[in-house]
Amino acid sequence: MSLVKLIEEADERGLAASGLACLDRCLPLLAEETEILRPLWAGVVGGEEDWPARLSASREALDAVGGPAPDVTTALVRTMLGAAPSEWAAGPLRTWADTCSVVALEIHQQLDAVGEDGPAAAAERLARCREDTGAVTDAADGAESTDGIGPLAAGELRRQIAILEILAETAGAAGVRRALDLSTEGQRVLRAVVSRRARAGS
């Protein structure tokens, strides 16, 4: 099933976890402390009762964190959390999860720096991969896909799909725990990329 279809069919828990996972994996671009959002994962488990309060606390925690000089990418990461709905309802959560999916893929594609045909063409490739069930196979090994997205973006696509599948198949806290583990794997990948770039620029 395509990523777009999985988002369309996900329930509130799956949508909240999917959006949060996208944001969580991008945190290394913003802060050295990459467990800031762990309490919000508990909010996903708690659902309607816990989500609003934990979301508010997570925003305050992220605002208090110092990080690299602001740029377009770090602003996007902050905006992802700022746009999260406090209402535990499928409609707003689906809109947020879909936006987070696109933004996270765009960030990973920028770090891949694959192709020289401009941002519009890159966005078109990502949109095609989100709607293409065959993109799952291409992304499975984290290698550059046949649609021209780089290995980082392909790995991010794979994780987004896998997390939504896990949450659809595994109920309760167990599914959220597995989604968090998979997201943490992606976070480590991006943190390594950020570290390499920092060393290269020093």
List the predicted regions and their residue ranges.
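General structural signal for secondary-structure boundaries
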Residues: 5-8, 82, 183
